[in-house]
């Protein structure tokens, strides 16, 4: 088992290298269908598995196409990681869609709606007290 510090360093290296591959290395047109950014990389303690969380901006169709393109390029990404990062074994790579940004945006929107509703309620109650 690798130390937490080592896992963190490998995770950040994978994130940096895969980001570079998204910009310059992956030639699949489906990957360019939506704007892709890597939000997080989760590497297992034995450095054998890497979950790469991606956030995709665009329509639902563009998101689906982009995920298909990323999943089909897993072999290329793993081979490139093996060449760019010096590890005994190159981790198995899995791309997962990260929807946390969308959930956070939706939550903020709901909180803002509640705040606006409370302001309207307070404004409605205050004039009634003046009578």
UniProtKB/Swiss-Prot annotation:
InterPro entries: KH_dom-like_a/b, RbfA, RbfA_dom_sf, Ribosome-bd_factorA_CS. It is found in: Cytoplasm. One of its GO terms (biological process) is maturation of SSU-rRNA. Keywords: Cytoplasm, Ribosome biogenesis. One of its GO terms (cellular component) is cytosol. One of its GO terms (molecular function) is ribosomal small subunit binding. One of several proteins that assist in the late maturation steps of the functional core of the 30S ribosomal subunit. Associates with free 30S ribosomal subunits (but not with 30S subunits that are part of 70S ribosomes or polysomes). Required for efficient processing of 16S rRNA. May interact with the 5'-terminal helix region of 16S rRNA. Belongs to the RbfA family. Monomer. Binds 30S ribosomal subunits, but not 50S ribosomal subunits or 70S ribosomes. This is Ribosome-binding factor A. It comes from Gloeothece citriformis (strain PCC 7424).
